[in-house]
């Protein structure tokens, strides 16, 4: 099979086949999976006590220059396993049998048609736990609509507010506009957050924002927008875990070669509370570091 791909906002119109991809994500049509394992580094309502059943896909349509998963996001590593929908569906069931709280699909939207089919198959085979779409936020609404009724939880990002910042750090000047439209669609699909008896999220949308050193005003604008637009119809997760990847240090702007100062993070968590947001997650002061990073192949 081959297509001219326009799944993401970059609209490459690039040729993609089952084995080759010439677009920005550099990915073929068949999903390339690097790692499948329980993961304990997500928000408490996702990871719980048994972990989130995480499937890490290779490639990415955003390509932030500071990505902590750059080993698998900047093109293909050479270590991925191609998995069609039927194989993925079986892997989800194996994860469910291991006792995880949910199936957590990480950075898969460039494979959306095949992943959507995998969810349909696994549901038909009896999967009962929630399916989480763990994505960058830089999505096309038309592609998200392929997942309508299949995704229980969106775990998404709102990374940048300023056009100048998103251009500098992800070569995506339209990031904020596209992400606002995409987030509206995610919230429409999931509705308000719903917790089960163990305080695990069954349905809803979590919007993450990773604070970056030197970009406080971007963070403030994003919090203003999210609270005014959605309030407690979503969870806001304000993160301070940014750790400059050692392998990328020579390519990063100077301000991104350090972590977020603790005082800056406290300032913004206080601001989020002042805005009146109740559904929120904040991190401990020592959240930066590599201990929660997956061990990719």
Predicted segments with their positions:
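Anionic-ligand binding region
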Residues: 167-197
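Non-cysteine beta-strand/loop elements that form the S-adenosyl-L-methionine
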Residues: 148-165, 233-241
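Auxiliary Fe-S-binding modules of radical SAM enzymes
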Residues: 1-21, 191-297
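Short glycine-enriched, charge-decorated loop/helix-capping segments at active-site entrances
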Residues: 71-81, 168-173, 251-259
């Amino acid at each position: 099979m081959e297509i001219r791909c326009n799944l993401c906002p970059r609209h490459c119109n690039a040729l993609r086949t089952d084995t080759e991809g010439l677009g920005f994500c550099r990915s073929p049509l068949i999903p390339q999976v690097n790692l499948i394992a329980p993961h304990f580094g997500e928000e408490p309502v996702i990871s719980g006590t048994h972990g989130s059943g995480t499937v890490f896909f290779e490639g990415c349509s955003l390509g932030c220059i500071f990505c902590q998963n750059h080993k698998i996001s900047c093109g293909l590593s050479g270590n991925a396993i191609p998995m069609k929908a039927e194989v993925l569906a079986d892997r989800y069931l194996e994860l469910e049998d291991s006792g995880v709280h949910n199936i957590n699909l990480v950075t898969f939207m460039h494979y959306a048609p095949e992943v959507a089919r995998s969810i349909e198959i696994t549901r038909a085979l009896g999967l009962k736990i929630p399916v989480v779409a763990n994505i960058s936020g830089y999505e096309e609404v038309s592609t998200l609509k392929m997942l309508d009724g299949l995704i229980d939880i969106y775990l998404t990002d709102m990374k940048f507010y300023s056009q100048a910042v998103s251009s500098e750090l992800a070569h995506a000047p339209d990031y904020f506009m596209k992400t606002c439209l995409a987030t509206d669609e995610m919230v429409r699909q999931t509705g308000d957050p719903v917790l089960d008896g163990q305080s695990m999220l069954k349905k809803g949308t979590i919007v993450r924002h990773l604070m970056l050193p030197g970009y406080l005003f971007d963070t403030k604008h994003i919090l203003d927008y999210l609270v005014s637009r959605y309030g407690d119809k979503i969870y806001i997760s304000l993160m301070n875990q940014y750790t400059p990847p050692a392998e990328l240090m020579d390519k990063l702007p100077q301000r991104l070669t350090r972590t977020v100062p603790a005082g800056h993070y406290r300032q913004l968590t206080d601001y989020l509370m002042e805005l009146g947001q109740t559904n929120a997650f904040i991190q401990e002061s020592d959240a930066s570091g590599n201990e929660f990073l997956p061990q990719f192949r």
